[in-house]
Amino acid sequence: MSMPATSTKTTKLATSLIDEYALLGWRAMLTEVNLSPKPGLVDRINCGAHKDMALEDFHRSALAIQGWLPRFIEFGACSAEMAPEAVLNGLRPIGMACEGDMFRATAGVNTHKGSIFSLGLLCAAIGRLLQLNQPVTPTTVCSTAASFCRGLTDRELRTNNSQRTAGQRLYQQLGLTGARGEAEAGYPLVINHALPHYLTLLDQGLDPELALLDTLLLLMATNGDTNVASRGGEGGLRWLQREAQTLLNNGGIRTPADLDYLRQFDRECIERNLSPGGSADLLILTWFLAQI
């Protein structure tokens, strides 16, 4: 499939640098899906609350998406002189083409649609910052991504029409803004909570997988996850948030023995058909930003 043109302007970025960030995006997706055990999510142990996807689907999907991440970076660089609010429209065709390759790789299974949106935004932000010779840090990347999304929630969630999307219904019923709201706000759950939490645990010498699992619990406890709400309504979301917070209050995931609590949580999520996919997407961003 031919890739959409990025821009008429050229980029001065080295291909090796672009590929380095794209590789980090791929590794972030693999790190998340291979992390086990994760409540309600596909991992190395089981398929969580999903009957239509397996671990291998995520591996194929991540590989397909990796090939597109350089395009997001390149577009971010080539559009560096554009007003940030104008960038998102240019990213959409790249995202849709990437999504098409994901669906081809998985025979129609939606494994990483949320990550295409969020990683695409962050990669474009990185390209813009590099092109402008500005520092690439978690904070600058997320604030730049936020500038691309200014007004997105108003435009896409508060619009009233006869054929409301799932996101519009959840916003109007529960006030949840989902991936759009988190992006427009500059990923505060990641920047202010998950990322510092994860880095602190690593600094304390905790095993990286345990640290990431504990960080997932933090995200599950604080995120208004539209994936959960679409499956279990407000009651399902509040239950999942309470259970995750209870585990954190009881000490979180600090030793291999604590994994038993996650396995039980996983069984309960499967019984309730709840999958915190939005929190998984934010965990991908957390790991990705921790590397830059």
From Swiss-Prot:
A Pfam family: CitG
EC numbers: 2.4.2.52
GO molecular function annotations of the record: ATP binding; triphosphoribosyl-dephospho-CoA synthase activity
Source organism superkingdom: Bacteria
GO process terms (BP): prosthetic group biosynthetic process
Keyword Cell membrane among record annotations: no
Function (record text): Catalyzes the formation of 2-(5''-triphosphoribosyl)-3'-dephosphocoenzyme-A, the precursor of the prosthetic group of the holo-acyl carrier protein (gamma chain) of citrate lyase, from ATP and dephospho-CoA.
Family: Belongs to the CitG/MdcB family.
Name used for this protein in its record: 2-(5''-triphosphoribosyl)-3'-dephosphocoenzyme-A synthase
Taxonomic placement: Bacteria, Pseudomonadati, Pseudomonadota, Gammaproteobacteria, Enterobacterales
Gene giving rise to this polypeptide: citG
